[in-house]
């Protein structure tokens, strides 16, 4: 138990350091949790978009409507925010599982963020995924991709056919696309056969995925809890992941991959 706690602390420290390598400057426009900026949280979006007016060590002040904020850790600031919820249909379970799972996220994000900050898209084939991915005009605005579908240790089901991770990777790996964090709610995609290769893609900043079968309700609750900590409370990805996994019953199968390495 002590060894696991030490590993978690080390991973959280590394995650914070990596987050801070995204350097900020005075004049940068950033997003910050309204609670971190001590603003009224009763707003359409949990985040506040503003300009950095002062930086000191690892903290920054941002411009408010009639004042400036107190110092906020730079680890709580992000320059970009856009979430894509990508449902990968299979015909058989869409009405009973995939659509309800996607809709649970839609309702949650409608409470958390403004409408323009979340995009929803459905595909059933690699061709549809390829057309959608290639025609996105604002790839750099998407920072997080949530995959809703069926998975196993080396593939994801598109329509009625299982497609290997390499086939999916070849489509997503476009030149010049800003790296994104992927949260896969597809069963077993956290296993090394899928997660290791996927997390090495230039388009993948990191991958969060289960290494076992996961119930749809647990997947939904874990995902919502993760984004609660990440966006509403302004925690780092590593801290948000650990807290979401600890807080969600039976969510211990979720793993976090980065650059081909299992980091949590």
PLM features: what roles do these ranges have?
Residues 6-26:
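Mixed-charge, Lys/Arg-rich low-complexity intrinsically disordered regions
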Residues 21-41:
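Short coil-to-beta transition motif at edge beta-strands of beta-rich domains
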Residues 42-55:
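Short beta-strand-centered aromatic/proline hotspots
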Residues 58-61:
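Short aromatic-glycine-enriched beta-strand elements
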Residues 65-82:
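Intrinsically disordered, low-complexity, charged/polar segments
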Residues 79-147, 151, 161-165, 179, ...:
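A domain-level signal for caspase-like cysteine endopeptidase catalytic cores
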Residues 143-156, 201-207:
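Active-site microenvironments of hydrolase-like enzyme catalytic domains
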Residues 181-264:
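Active-site-proximal C-terminal subdomain of hydrolase catalytic domains
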């Amino acid at each position: 138990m002590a060894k696991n706690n030490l590993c978690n602390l080390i991973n959280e420290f590394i995650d914070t350091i990596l987050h801070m390598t995204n350097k900020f400057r005075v004049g940068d426009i950033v997003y910050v949790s309204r609670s971190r900026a001590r603003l009224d949280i009763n707003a359409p979006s949990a985040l506040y978009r503003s300009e950095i007016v002062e930086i000191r060590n690892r903290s920054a002040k941002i411009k408010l409507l009639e004042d400036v904020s107190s110092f906020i850790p730079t680890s709580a600031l992000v320059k970009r925010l856009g979430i894509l919820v990508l449902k990968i249909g299979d015909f058989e379970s869409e009405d009973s599982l995939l659509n309800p799972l996607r809709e649970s996220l839609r309702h949650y994000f409608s409470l958390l963020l403004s409408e323009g900050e979340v995009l929803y898209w459905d595909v059933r084939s690699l061709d549809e995924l390829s057309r959608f991915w290639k025609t996105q005009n604002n790839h750099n605005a998407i920072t997080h991709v949530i995959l809703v579908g069926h998975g196993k240790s080396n593939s994801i089901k598109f329509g009625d056919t299982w497609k290997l991770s390499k086939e999916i990777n070849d489509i997503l790996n476009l030149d010049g696309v800003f790296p994104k964090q992927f949260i896969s709610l597809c069963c077993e995609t956290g296993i090394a056969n899928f997660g290791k290769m996927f997390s090495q893609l230039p388009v993948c900043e990191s991958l969060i995925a289960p290494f076992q079968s996961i119930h749809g309700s647990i997947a939904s609750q874990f995902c919502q809890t993760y984004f609660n900590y990440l966006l509403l409370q302004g925690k780092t990805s590593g801290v948000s992941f650990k807290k979401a996994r600890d807080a969600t019953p039976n969510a211990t199968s979720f793993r976090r991959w980065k650059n081909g390495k299992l980091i949590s």
